[in-house]
From Swiss-Prot:
The gene is rplO. Coiled coil: none annotated. Residues 21-35, 42-52 have a biased composition (Gly residues). The lineage of its organism: Bacteria, Pseudomonadati, Thermodesulfobacteriota, Desulfovibrionia, Desulfovibrionales. One of its GO terms (molecular function) is structural constituent of ribosome. It comes from the Bacteria. Residues 14-63 are annotated as: Disordered. This is Large ribosomal subunit protein uL15.
């Protein structure tokens, strides 16, 4: 028997609470929700952070610092092994080729990562390269062209 095969005995496992099935069950009538009020209703309760109409904490505290999220540069990553498998027999790989093969969305910024091996001399165009990817491409006799933008 292994650690992930351990389980409690059937009589030790708590049975599921079945509410609203008669007063003899102990959870009939109001089904553990108390008497009346917003929380007793279907779909009742308040959203997280709601303080009953009082100005909530996240609005009472001042904003601090600079939020760069809208301007954050995001890249779609492609590993070398996937790139080599998709372009077998081709030595010049441009961004348009990558978009055309469906390796990433058209117009996306592309970063090449160094997972996998390169045996042929490739000329690869992308917005960014990891250090290991650029090194592997150069060691195979190829060229890693980093584009602007």
């Amino acid at each position: 028997m292994r650690l992930h095969e351990l389980y409690p005995f059937a009589e030790e496992r708590a049975s599921r609470k079945r509410v609203g099935r008669g007063s003899g069950s102990g959870l009939g009538c109001t089904s553990g929700k108390g008497n009346k009020g917003q929380n007793a209703r279907a779909g009742g309760g308040v959203r997280p952070g709601f303080e009953g109409g009082q100005m909530p904490l996240q609005r009472r505290l001042p904003k601090r610092g600079f939020k760069n999220a809208p301007f954050k540069a995001t890249y779609e990553v492609i590993n070398l092994d996937r790139l080599v498998a998709s372009f077998e027999g081709k030595t010049d790989i441009t961004l348009e080729d990558i978009y055309a093969r469906g390796l990433c969305k058209a117009g996306a910024s592309v970063k090449i990562l160094g997972v996998g091996e390169v045996s042929v001399a490739l000329t690869v165009e992308a917005h960014k390269f990891s250090a290991s990817a650029a090194e592997k491409i150069r060691n195979a006799g190829g060229e890693a062209k980093a584009l602007e933008g």
